[in-house]
Amino acid sequence: MDDAAVLKRRGYIMGINLGEGSYAKVKSAYSERLKFNVAVKIIDRKKAPTDFLEKFLPREIEILAMLNHRSIIKTYEIFETSDGKVYIVMELGVQGDLLEFIKTRGALQEDDARKKFHQLSSAIKYCHDLDVVHRDLKCENLLLDKDFNIKLSDFGFSKRCLRDDSGRLTLSKTFCGSAAYAAPEVLQGIPYQPKVYDIWSLGVILYIMVCGSMPYDDSNIKKMLRIQKEHRVNFPRSKHLTGECKDLIYRMLQPDVTRRLHIDEILSHCWVQPKARGLSSAAVNKEGESSRAAEPPWTPEPSSDKKSATKLEPREEVRPEPRAEPSPEEEMATVQVSRQSEAVGLPSEQPSKTEEGAPPQPSETHA
């Protein structure tokens, strides 16, 4: 029995193809019971790899069944046929995904970015409170409803965190996701804290929201990792970002996992909190204070305001004190992550080169 006939028997009228891979595809469908369109993910067990069938698919099904949050794509039904096909009926993101939205309309104004980022962060807090981690946060996995609200989707790499006998979360060893959104510890191929990994990806997403470009160029992973570990972040001056917004991004893109923000600290950050009240404010831990030493706020380096004749735009660069080059032992390990910046069609920002011992000059990029 073909997919259309299977869905018809379950009360769905199959529509157009929304996406397709080697062993899974997503179709739109009209639900005769719900009286609106849905998305149906169809997975063919006969074509899927063993690792996916034994580990990732059971995790995804278990987690989808337990999640219920206004900013997470709803799962209406999961069923399987005798010929080995799994059907996951989900809420449809009628306005597409955030990446296409930004590619079409450009970077978001801070107020719009604040609203969407608060919705996303609230969804991540909900997951983390359940000890669920996503591990593949990226703009393509953030769908938009009819009112352009964020809906977190694609829990294919998600998992429930395990705890040891003392109650501490155990480290993850599966290196997954997209390189452009991956934290330094993941790129190095070492066991990592999955909740902390999610926070780094949130920082990349917020940067893309307000800048319309990638914070790092993943065409050279080794170079990108070095820049990340030096805690260098560039911001386009033309966007006129507030210091509070830059500060939040800078703290999320912290290479030191012991100093990277927690989700409660993000939701209580001064950029998110003042104007986020009323937007799922119950998810915000207003009284939560960090027990860690406070990191100094972001401050730009002094730089020239001159622009080049080729209409290149100065960049404000954030960078700490110079550090020694990494030792051979710190070189990046090979990990199974995909390059992202070329595929998504967004430019990436790179810091400018400076002479040794000289103060950094403003980076430039095409306007």
Curated annotation (Swiss-Prot):
GO molecular function: ATP binding; magnesium ion binding; protein serine kinase activity; protein serine/threonine kinase activity; tau-protein kinase activity
UniProt main location, coarse: cytoplasm
Subunit-structure text: Interacts with TSSK2. Interacts with HSP90; this interaction stabilizes TSSK1.
Species of the source: Bos taurus (Bovine)
Gene Ontology CC annotations of this record: acrosomal vesicle; cytoplasm; motile cilium
Residues bound to ATP: 18-26, 41
Catalytic reactions on record: L-seryl-[protein] + ATP = O-phospho-L-seryl-[protein] + ADP + H(+); L-threonyl-[protein] + ATP = O-phospho-L-threonyl-[protein] + ADP + H(+)
Encoding gene per record: TSSK1B
Name of the protein: Testis-specific serine/threonine-protein kinase 1
GO biological process: intracellular signal transduction; microtubule cytoskeleton organization; spermatid development
EC code(s) of this entry: 2.7.11.1
Keywords: ATP-binding, Cell projection, Cilium, Cytoplasm, Cytoplasmic vesicle, Developmental protein, Differentiation, Flagellum, Kinase, Magnesium, Metal-binding, Nucleotide-binding, Phosphoprotein, Serine/threonine-protein kinase, Spermatogenesis, Transferase, Ubl conjugation
Cofactor(s) this protein requires: Mg(2+)
Source taxonomy: Eukaryota, Metazoa, Chordata, Craniata, Vertebrata
Cystine pairings recorded for this chain: none
Localization, UniProt: Cytoplasm; Cytoplasmic vesicle, Secretory vesicle, Acrosome; Cell projection, Cilium, Flagellum
Region spans: Disordered: 282-367
Signal peptide: none
List of residues that carry Phosphothreonine: 174
